[in-house]
């Protein structure tokens, strides 16, 4: 349940959640496994997995949702080889070249034949809906997968007035200033990893890992015009992460000490422990987002 990445959206119109109403809306788009002829299926599943009973888990004004995707694994090379073999056979038998339309129809036929025998894989993606700060946090490093979940949520509830989180000042400008000055806002501590890019196509990209970012070797790249597009940071004593210039927060890692905050509950009641961990995690993520927004100079005015 502990989030590992954050793709952040903000509501550009006031948004509130009625848990019971949202639960009913999600039920119409519940996940069901692929049939023999389905290439993929995507739908909402229990927010707390096998220990939960509902599609939405709520604590205060914080709401967790989860979606499951099943995809058939049908390698394109397998289809290509089967198609080439069939095309060669028919062209030899009929002594003519097949048209593209005929080949496309054959490809569809081959795909339909192979689908029932294909293996499948499942993945899950979660999101935290936070009306109290008017944001949605998606646990994914992929913008495309995050958008897919938001599209499903929008389809379920009819409207979802969100836009990606963006800031008044370009993030790379702020990150470059922090690295240049060797100082971050009080809530954060700079770690030992950064990626710098030049604005020009010829300038290239340079990456530093496990290196003191205050060294002249690093700062020299800033002097010649490169800007920081990725910077490893630590939030208080709780979260390590990589902040990117596109506002994505990746490689989110909660410290062992922080995750142990509910150890006194034990594991006799898994749902009680999950509920407590959800409250702990969501509170700290809200604190992280609020601190990040403040440190980066505030959100861009919504349009």
From Swiss-Prot:
GO cellular component: bacterial nucleoid; cytoplasm
Single GO molecular function: double-stranded DNA binding
Domain of life of the native organism: Bacteria
Principal location listed in the UniProt entry: cytoplasm
UniProt subcellular location: Cytoplasm, Nucleoid
Entry's Gene Ontology BP terms: DNA recombination; regulation of DNA recombination
Keyword Hydrolase on entry: no
UniProt entry keywords in alphabetical sequence: Cytoplasm, DNA recombination
InterPro entries in the record: RdgC (IPR007476)
Family recorded in the similarity comment: Belongs to the RdgC family.
Primary role: May be involved in recombination.
PANTHER family given in the database record: RECOMBINATION-ASSOCIATED PROTEIN RDGC
Protein name from the UniProt record: Recombination-associated protein RdgC
Organism of derivation: Shewanella pealeana (strain ATCC 700345 / ANG-SQ1)
């Amino acid at each position: 349940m502990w989030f590992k990445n954050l793709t952040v959206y903000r509501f550009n119109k006031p948004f509130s959640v009625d848990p019971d109403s949202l639960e009913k809306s999600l039920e119409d788009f519940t996940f069901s496994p692929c049939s023999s002829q389905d290439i993929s299926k995507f739908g909402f599943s229990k927010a707390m997995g096998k220990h939960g009973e509902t599609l939405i888990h709520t604590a205060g004004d914080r709401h967790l949702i989860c979606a499951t995707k099943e995809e058939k694994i049908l390698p394109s090379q397998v289809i290509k080889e089967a198609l080439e073999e069939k095309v060669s056979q028919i062209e030899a038998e009929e002594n003519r070249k097949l048209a593209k339309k005929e080949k496309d129809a054959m490809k569809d036929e081959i795909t339909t034949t192979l689908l029932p025998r294909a293996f499948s894989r499942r993945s899950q993606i979660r999101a935290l809906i936070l009306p109290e700060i008017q944001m949605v946090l998606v646990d994914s490093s992929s913008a495309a997968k995050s958008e897919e979940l938001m599209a499903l949520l929008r389809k379920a509830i009819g409207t979802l007035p969100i836009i990606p989180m963006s800031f008044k000042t370009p993030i790379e400008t702020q990150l470059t200033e922090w690295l240049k000055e060797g100082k971050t806002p009080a809530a954060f501590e700079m770690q030992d990893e950064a990626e710098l890019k030049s604005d020009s196509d010829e300038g290239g990209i340079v990456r530093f890992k496990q290196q003191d970012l205050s060294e002249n070797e690093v700062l020299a790249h800033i002097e010649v015009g490169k800007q920081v597009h990725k910077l490893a940071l630590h939030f208080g004593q709780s979260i390590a992460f990589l902040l990117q210039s596109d506002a994505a927060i990746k490689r989110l890692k909660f410290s062992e000490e922080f995750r142990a905050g509910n150890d006194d509950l034990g594991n006799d009641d898994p749902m009680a422990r999950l509920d407590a961990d959800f409250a702990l995690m969501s509170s700290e993520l809200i604190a992280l987002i609020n601190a990040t927004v403040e440190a980066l100079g505030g959100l861009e005015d919504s349009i």
